[in-house]
Amino acid sequence: MSVIKRLPRYYRFLGELKKNNITRISSKELSQRMGLTASQIRQDLNCFGGFGQQGYGYNVEQLQNEIGTILGVQNGFKTILFGCGNLGRAIASHMTFEDRGFELVGLFDSNADKMKDIRIKGLSVYPVEDLEVYCKEVEPKVAVLCVPTEAAPAIVERLVNLGITNFWNFSHYDIASNYPGVTVENVHLNDSLMTLSYQIMNREEQAD
């Protein structure tokens, strides 16, 4: 699982190399850019067959394409988003879903009646009451939750009953514990911020 967590980072770094017209790179050079060891990179990539050539290194475009295939960026999973407040709008507006294997097809909010004139990436905001009809017609596969934690349980229950079992979860609701068969990627921004706090304190202590 830790290898899978690193693959999107490889994909992103390789994309930046392509933008800078770098066509090949050694594991040592890649390790210096990413803050990993060269042996870790070789070990990670060997889990999927290995893609480098001794004495040549890695073809940047080919390696990014291979990693993209492993991650499924070609899939275009139909995705709906719940909660069009500040966080939900930012994610819907600025995330490049289509470049990451997803197609954002629908937006839902409990206050959709107040958002009739709002379009986010060309999408209207639907009321939650339309969920069942919408899902039967469109058949989305993934749900993004940008709702308050207290609102999440009822929404998740409805989604699971409709056959949606894949979640990108920005709420603090523990979906996996309540629905063991689902696939969940939790995003806890507060955890990330506290990790930064620790790193700052640790660096300052070492500097003293």
Predicted features, each with a name:
Residues 1-23:
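Extreme N-terminal segment that seeds HTH/winged-HTH DNA-binding domains in transcriptional regulators
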Residues 24, 28, 33-77:
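HTH-adjacent hinge/linker in prokaryotic transcriptional regulators
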Residues 72-112:
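Glycine-rich adenosine-cofactor-binding loop
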